[in-house]
Amino acid sequence: MAVWLPAQNKFYLPTQPITKILSSDDYVSRTNIFYHATSDRLLIVGHPLYEVTRANDNTMTVPKVSPNQYRVFRVRFPDPNRFAFGDKDIFDPETERLVWGLRGIEIGRGQPLGVGISGNPLLNRFDDAENPSRYNNTHATGDNRQNVAFDAKQTQMFLIGCTPATGEHWSIARRCAGTQFQLGDCPPIELVNTVIEDGDMFDIGLGAMDFGSLQANKADAPLDIAGTVCKYPDYIKMGQEVHGNSLFFFARREQMYLRHVFTHAGIVSEKEKVPTSAYIAAKAEQPQNTIATDNYFVAPSGSLVSSDVQIFNRPYWLQRSQGQNNGICWRNELFVTVADNTRGTTMNINVLNKATPETYDSADYNEYTRHVEEYELSFIVQLCKVKLTPENLAFLHNMDPTIIDSWQLTVSQPPANAIEDKYRFIESLATKCPDNVPPPTPTDPYKDLRFWDVDLSERMSEQLDQFPLGRKFLYQSGLAQRSVPKTVNFRKRRSSNTTVAKRRRRA
């Protein structure tokens, strides 16, 4: 008996074609000309926990310089199209434009290794949950804040790109319409992406979150991050960026272990209390009859700081970026995002506040704390060319129109056949509005963001062998080989006694 059955296999239609993003190697050609650029010694000094301001007008007197802050350097290179090259065949200004391509970088860090301290004299540290000596269930009342400090999670990282790096953190979200909530309910949270700016805090082991909007008591976090935002680089989003401008490559090393386990004081909401099915009730006379708080938190520690695991003070060579941009520095600038708290030493300074005392008294001295940081940036850049074809210009315009604007490309206008009218006092109310509005002045797309500007316009050199990073690049790439010293053989000098003996024999 024949029975008809429907086909069991499924048919898959081809996906819709997507716009192909070209690699920079497809429209950028490289020359054999390399330049070395290095910055000055970059120094910064400030208070490690907070910004010091003048009491009467809130004017900043000492900046906040924490070892747990990002340092974002905006490096500006000179425009290669304005260079006066001796060789006229390097490029044709009518059909080509010059750009820089990153080939090597070394981030130098000064100052000795040291462990930084992060703490709060009024930290919401209720009880020890690691080795408790008694059952404490009085977390819902009183002021139990204590003076607690710890060393943060150890972090070393840097990110290189021609646009600022993107960070992520958790912040308060908008409640849905029609949602019933009461005062004291936990707000919804969402993942937020923002630009990592100079001076932003990175994660110290307590999470990447907006502590200002999610911690109203200002006591659940150390002073340096209380009321601020801790950001973590969004490697996933930057890795999926279509043009690959924000992240050419990166290096990171993070480590942490749990030093102590504490609890926070405060009322545990009835909506999120420990379910009765998770425990067996205690007797009425037992203190365990009232459940203690389950609001645990850890005191992190970055552990040992060693020079064996340093990612700085060494060269990095760029052969192939992880994205489509293979190291081309559009708009002649580069963003170097650095996070390093392995040199987080807090300097303690004390000064006499009265005449020389006869006996020691703490009231005779004023105590101050400072933190210092030292950087030096070195680069090897390669001269590259972009042909001004319609395809290349259209692609670059879709990626970033300001790139073409900075090249000052002009289009020839057709000759005018008729006479034109030219008004005097065209800006006055007596005449018509002007027809041709002057082009707007180019604005900085990052004018509202904080960066450490490093201008290398006058610090470029073609003599690579005169600089440490340049010599390393020459030897690594094989562009120049140091000749091996010739071996010199010295004849062994005969002693005078042997020579006299031979003369006597001949005689």
Curated annotation (Swiss-Prot):
Segments traversing the membrane: none
Keyword terms of this UniProt record: Capsid protein, Disulfide bond, Host nucleus, Host-virus interaction, Late protein, T=7 icosahedral capsid protein, Viral attachment to host cell, Viral penetration into host cytoplasm, Virion, Virus endocytosis by host, Virus entry into host cell
Record keyword Translocase present: no
Entry GO MF terms: structural molecule activity
Recorded superkingdom: Viruses
Family annotation (InterPro entries): Capsid_L1_Papillomavir, Capsid_L1_sf_Papillomavir, dsDNA_vir_gr_I_capsid
Gene Ontology CC: host cell nucleus; T=7 icosahedral viral capsid
Subcellular localization: Virion; Host nucleus
Pfam families: Late_protein_L1
Subunit-level organization: Self-assembles into homopentamers. The capsid has an icosahedral symmetry and consists of 72 capsomers, with each capsomer being a pentamer of L1. Interacts with the minor capsid protein L2; this interaction is necessary for viral genome encapsidation. Interacts with protein E2; this interaction enhances E2-dependent replication and transcription activation.
Family per record: Belongs to the papillomaviridae L1 protein family.
Function in brief: Forms an icosahedral capsid with a T=7 symmetry and a 50 nm diameter. The capsid is composed of 72 pentamers linked to each other by disulfide bonds and associated with L2 proteins. Binds to heparan sulfate proteoglycans on cell surface of basal layer keratinocytes to provide initial virion attachment. This binding mediates a conformational change in the virus capsid that facilitates efficient infection. The virion enters the host cell via endocytosis. During virus trafficking, L1 protein dissociates from the viral DNA and the genomic DNA is released to the host nucleus.
Protein name: Major capsid protein L1
Record organism: Human papillomavirus type 63
